């Protein structure tokens, strides 16, 4: 059994449902310490994090990832227990197999092998690992980055081991991510008897035109690196608990996924202009969960693409598709950030899995990238 597969199995066995680490980080820390890494445990609240490093020079190359996983859902729908790593037809199944315990296992084994072969390597190799990526992400990577900045540690390059590949390992890497902003909107009407609508003000009826306008608005055209901004309602609630009552309020929740084309303030102003145009009485609360970032095709991305070409014989596609990741926190330091990991098709799904053969290739890609950077 390969070292990467062995480590992945150990991690899958730990039911580390966010924000519980379930001992995963102890396994990783013990392995890294055994090859000379210095490690700091950085707990914040109930979240476990660690920071590890080997070397004392620049450039500073960081591997970043998370040990927490999403809940398995209905376990009767799994063909094997979600926290029992199970090999079948060349794949390994288990919660976290794709997102992202395979990435973590490959990064750690690659770093181990590299420092064993190059104990006096140029540069510094580091790890930022958290158990708070699948949850609120308030006490995880963001807090570790704040800690490093307080210590004046300057990061140069970061590989986030998220499942970035689409159909084949290495066919895509992320060189940026869209931002995410949530809005919680309350449309205020007047409650009344449903038989006497002239004595009430129905917030549901009032909202229709404005909601249609918001849903049909073309916020931008995107650009060569980012798809157009997306606006989606994901929850609408109204009703007074009885069939003969016009409700006093309607509550709606929506989300923007946006490129660096806009500021959050510009998007907020556009929404409020539409609501005002339709003369709605409303209250709105905003929550910016992440700002967009774009690292571009820098030195790290160039070397990662070279490593993928050498090992997987693919011309990888750099893109900015998908959701948010902890790379957004690391990018605020000015560090070049890319995301490179396994195929993402089954992430968060029942019977989550990864191709076993991809584990060694992914380990080799990380190892080769370290060679090229140092």
From Swiss-Prot:
BP-aspect Gene Ontology terms: diaminopimelate biosynthetic process; L-arginine biosynthetic process; lysine biosynthetic process via diaminopimelate
Alphabetical list of CDD domains matching this protein: M20_DapE_proteobac
GO MF entry, a single one: acetylornithine deacetylase activity
One Pfam entry name: Peptidase_M20
InterPro entries, sorted: ArgE/DapE_CS, Bact_exopeptidase_dim_dom, DapE_proteobac, Peptidase_M20, Peptidase_M20_dimer, Peptidase_M20A
Catalytic reaction(s) noted: N-succinyl-(2S,6S)-2,6-diaminopimelate + H2O = (2S,6S)-2,6-diaminopimelate + succinate
Binding-site residues for Zn(2+) 1, renumbered to this chain: 66, 99, 162
Highest taxon above the source species: Bacteria
Annotated binding of Zn(2+) 2, by residue: 99, 134, 348
Family annotation (SUPFAM superfamilies): Bacterial exopeptidase dimerisation domain (SSF55031), Zn-dependent exopeptidases (SSF53187)
Enzyme class: hydrolase
Keyword terms, alphabetized: Amino-acid biosynthesis, Cobalt, Diaminopimelate biosynthesis, Hydrolase, Lysine biosynthesis, Metal-binding, Zinc
Co-factor binding comment: Binds 2 Zn(2+) or Co(2+) ions per subunit.
EC number: 3.5.1.18
Record pathway: Amino-acid biosynthesis; L-lysine biosynthesis via DAP pathway; LL-2,6-diaminopimelate from (S)-tetrahydrodipicolinate (succinylase route): step 3/3
HAMAP family according to UniProt: DapE
Family membership noted in the UniProt record: Belongs to the peptidase M20A family. DapE subfamily.
Subunit record text: Homodimer.
Classification via PANTHER family: ACETYLORNITHINE DEACETYLASE (PTHR43808), N-ACETYL-L-CITRULLINE DEACETYLASE (PTHR43808:SF31)
Protein name: Succinyl-diaminopimelate desuccinylase
Organism: Coxiella burnetii (strain Dugway 5J108-111)
């Amino acid at each position: 059994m390969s070292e990467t597969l062995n480590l992945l199995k150990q991690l899958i066995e730990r039911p580390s449902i966010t924000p519980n680490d379930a001992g995963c980080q102890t396994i990783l820390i013990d392995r890294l310490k055994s090859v000379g890494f210095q490690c700091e445990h950085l707990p914040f609240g109930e979240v476990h994090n660690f920071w590890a490093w080997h070397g004392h020079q620049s450039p500073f190359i960081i591997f970043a990832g998370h040990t927490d996983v999403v809940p398995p859902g209905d376990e009767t729908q799994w063909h094997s227990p979600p926290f029992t790593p199970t090999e079948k037809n060349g794949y390994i199944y288990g919660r976290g197999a794709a997102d992202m315990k395979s990435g973590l296992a490959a990064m750690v084994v690659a770093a181990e092998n590299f420092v064993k072969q190059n104990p006096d390597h140029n540069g510094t190799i580091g790890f930022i690992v958290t158990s708070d990526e699948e949850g609120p992400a308030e006490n995880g990577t963001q807090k570790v980055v704040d800690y490093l900045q307080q210590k004046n540690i300057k990061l140069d390059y970061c590989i986030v081991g998220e499942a970035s590949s689409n159909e084949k390992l290495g066919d895509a890497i992320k060189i940026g991510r869209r931002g995410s902003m949530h809005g919680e909107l309350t449309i205020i009407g007047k409650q009344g008897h449903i038989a006497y609508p002239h004595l009430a003000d129905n917030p549901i009826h009032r909202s229709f035109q404005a909601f249609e306008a918001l849903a049909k608005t073309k916020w931008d055209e995107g650009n060569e690196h980012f798809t157009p901004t997306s606006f989606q309602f994901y929850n609408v609630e109204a009703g007074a608990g009885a069939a003969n009552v016009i409700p006093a309020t309607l509550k709606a929740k929506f989300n923007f996924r946006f490129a660096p084309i806009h500021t959050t303030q510009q998007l907020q102003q556009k929404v409020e202009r539409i609501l005002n145009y339709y003369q709605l009485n409303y209250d709105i609360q905003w929550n910016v969960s992440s700002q967009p970032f774009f690292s571009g095709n820098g030195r790290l991305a160039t070397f990662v693409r070279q490593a993928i070409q050498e090992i997987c014989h693919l011309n990888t596609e750099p893109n900015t598709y998908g959701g948010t990741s902890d790379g957004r926190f690391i990018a605020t330091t000015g560090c070049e950030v890319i995301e490179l990991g396994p195929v993402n098709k089954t992430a968060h799904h029942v019977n989550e899995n990864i191709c076993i053969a991809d584990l060694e290739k992914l380990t080799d890609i990380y190892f080769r990238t370290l060679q090229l950077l140092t």
